[in-house]
Amino acid sequence: MNPYLNAFLRSIIEAITEFLPVSSTGHLFLFSSFFPFYGENVEFDDLFDIFIQSGAILSVLFLYREKFKSQIVSSFRYILKQNSDSEGFHFLIQICIGAFPILIAGFIAKKFLDTIKARPDLLEILSGAWIFGGVLILVAEWYFHQRPEEKKSIGFKDSILIGIFQCMALIPGMSRSAATIITARFLGKDTKSSAEFSFFLAVPVLLAAGIYKLIKYRSILNGNTIPVLMFGFLVSFLLCTLVIRWFLRYIQKHSFSVFGVYRILLGVGVLVLTKLI
């Protein structure tokens, strides 16, 4: 397959799945199993995924640029004691608290996770994670609707719990978005607050992973690979911006249940496919 066509299709997959609770990593692995870049160049596949995830990060920063700007400015003024409004400072602290557990867990368990990703039965593992995550989404939605009222604000304790359970995303196919949204729903948070906090947590988590992989694979950056990487980055950014806007409109009127059903059907379908191949 032409590398630019491959890059375009992967960018579409990334844009659609990164912020939806369906596992972008799982979908990208499934695609690359059939259509790898440059034959068996797994390193380039991995590096390209980081570039399109960076495009996704930029889309969050672009859409919420005013919020991030105001919260950062407010934080500095609070630290310098130029005002008494601590909202911005607390917002940034909550993001750091929520991101900290998965960054530490990912660093500690790196070799073990690399071993899992290299297993020949990875598709079966992905299938199990898709199904398990789908069931959790449906249970979380059912539990949420048993509560007397929904909550919009996410406090420090919520950030800690969401951050801890975000570590489930280290399991291939579980999904970082799913782990954070499921936890937020169990805590009684409304759909928009759950989704947006998941978006915000993505920034430090994906940024840290991106910097690490960029340093690791810097030797394969050259005149042939950089144009393809930048093409994927730009396509991902543009499409992610559209998907996030659609997603926020969708969850204003619907629950996350449809994504749970989708995950279960996908997991069962891939599991059946692996048995037939």
From Swiss-Prot:
GO terms for cellular component: plasma membrane. It is a multi-pass membrane protein. The keyword Lyase does not apply. Pfam families: BacA. Keywords: Antibiotic resistance, Cell inner membrane, Cell membrane, Cell shape, Cell wall biogenesis/degradation, Hydrolase, Membrane, Peptidoglycan synthesis, Transmembrane, Transmembrane helix. The chain crosses the membrane at residues 19-39, 44-64, 89-109, 122-142, 154-174, 195-215, 224-244, 257-277. It is found in: Cell inner membrane. It is an enzyme of class 3 (hydrolase). It catalyses: di-trans,octa-cis-undecaprenyl diphosphate + H2O = di-trans,octa-cis-undecaprenyl phosphate + phosphate + H(+). Its EC number is 3.6.1.27. Its main location: membrane. InterPro entries: UppP. HAMAP family: Undec_diphosphatase. Bacitracin is thought to be involved in the inhibition of peptidoglycan synthesis by sequestering undecaprenyl diphosphate, thereby reducing the pool of lipid carrier available. Catalyzes the dephosphorylation of undecaprenyl diphosphate (UPP). Confers resistance to bacitracin. PANTHER family: UNDECAPRENYL-DIPHOSPHATASE. Belongs to the UppP family. This is Undecaprenyl-diphosphatase. It comes from Leptospira interrogans serogroup Icterohaemorrhagiae serovar Lai (strain 56601).
